[in-house]
Amino acid sequence: QKKDKKDRFY
């Protein structure tokens, strides 16, 4: 689970 710069979860 990675967190993007815009608070998006993958």
Swiss-Prot record:
Tissues where this protein is expressed: Expressed by the venom gland.
Q: What's the protein here called? A: Tachykinin-like peptide-VIII
Q: Which organism is it from?
A: Phoneutria nigriventer
Q: Which UniProt keywords apply?
A: Pyrrolidone carboxylic acid, Secreted
Principal localization reads secreted
Q: What is the lineage of its organism?
A: Eukaryota, Metazoa, Ecdysozoa, Arthropoda, Chelicerata
Which residue pairs form cystines in this protein? none
Compartments it resides in: Secreted
Give the family this protein belongs to, as stated in its UniProt record: Belongs to the tachykinin family.
Q: Can you tell me which residues the record assigns to a coiled coil?
A: none
Gene Ontology CC, one term? extracellular region
Q: Per the record's keyword annotation, is Manganese included, yes or no?
A: no
Domain of life according to the entry: Eukaryota
Pyrrolidone carboxylic acid sites (modified residues): 1
